[in-house]
Amino acid sequence: LPKDSEKRHLYELGKQLFFENGYVEIGMDHFALPSDSLHKAMEAKKLHRNFMGYTAGKTELMIGLGMSSISDSWYAFAQNEKDIDDYTKKVNQGIIPIFRGHLLTAKDLIIRKHILNLMCNLETEWNVGLGAQVKSEIIQRLKAIIDDGLIEISENKITVKEEGSMFVRNIFMAFDLRLIE
């Protein structure tokens, strides 16, 4: 398997080939032609992301079928059994083969919206649901990225600059309070 530096080089090479063939970057590791519905959704700020990748509209419900699949009802996640024997046993017994799940809290939903805004629009508005303390914690986690000039932060908004777009995962991870807890 390639090392991290080789992976980055392969990604940049692939990105260049996409650009040379008329594709545009629409999100993390995703490309589309300008005529594609994904690009149009990005331009209209209606791009959405779910477990399967980017979509041209919000996914209200996603039902995962099969072993290890993940379902998302927007307010909760559920993952099916990952082990084939456990999965088959539950299915044969007529039991829904859920391995684990999580109900999202009101705070989770606010954080989720900010993360999706960053993933899909490379910006999010601070004044939506975040308290001063949480904003301060997020800014502390983003300090190195701020110092490198990869994002702009104003009183009401955080915007990922073009040169920061390749670090959007690192940026939105600062919003995920569960990674810190």
Where is each model-derived feature located?
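C-terminal scaffold of the Radical SAM
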Residues: 1-128, 132
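An alpha-helix initiation/capping motif
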Residues: 8, 136, 162-165
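Short amphipathic alpha-helical interaction segments
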Residues: 131-147
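A short, conserved structural fragment
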Residues: 146-156
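Minor-groove-contacting beta-hairpin "wing" of winged helix-turn-helix DNA-binding domains
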Residues: 157-161
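Short, amphipathic alpha-helical interaction segments positioned at domain boundaries
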Residues: 163-181
